[in-house]
Every structure is written in structure tokens, then in C-alpha cells.
Amino acid sequence: MSLIKHLEYINKNPILKKSFEFGVEIIKLSKNIRIKYKEYSLADQLLRSGTSIGANANEAVIGSSKKDFINKMNISLKEAYESRYWLLLLASVDNIKNPDFYLDEIDEIIRMLVKIVKTSKETESAKK
């Protein structure tokens, strides 16, 4: 499948789209923090958690069961909370130029993931 087809697939799912776009921004931010501030450890922590959100959400969508879906989305949610922590920490020491942009984005992703997990759990419970 071509890059365009992959991106079309991602764009059809709101959480995949949002987490992919966030991941791209985090890659750029992490690179900038490493170059401008020489802060490698925290930039790497942010890079790992920020890109893991979309990776786990993507795994959830192609998961083998509803239980697997919920588990992977929960992991995405945990990674989102971790990303918010690193963003707050880096913003507190002035290593992020426009922290509100990133914090607004991660808060929106967290809201989306909380809703997905909650709805999925309720649907799963209703089946039992």
C-alpha cells in the first residue's frame, strides 16, 4: 500500500488522524529541543510517549478482539497522560516555545481516548 493510501486510512478515523498529527508535531518539537537546548533525555521521553499514542491506537483499530481494542486504547491514554507530563515539565523550564498549542492538542487527544475507552467498556459490559 502506498503512503497516500496509508494516510487516507488514517484520516478516516478521528483518533488515528489526531494522534498521527500530534506525533508529527512531537517529532519536530523533540528535534528542536535536542538541537536548541541540548536536552536529550527529556526530548527522548517526550518523543517516545508522544509517538506511542498513535502507534497503540493504530494497533487497537486492527486488534483481534474488543478486549484487545480496549487494552490498546488504554495504553494510548496512558501514553497521552505521560506526554502531557513531559510537555508540562519542558514548558516549566522554558524549553517549549508555544506550550499551549501542544497542551491543547494533548488534552483533546486525552478527551477523545477517555470517551473511546469509556464507551467501549460500556458496550462490552452490556453484551455480558
Outline where the language-model segments fall.
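Short, C-terminally biased terminal segments at protein or domain edges
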Residues: 1-55, 59, 63-128
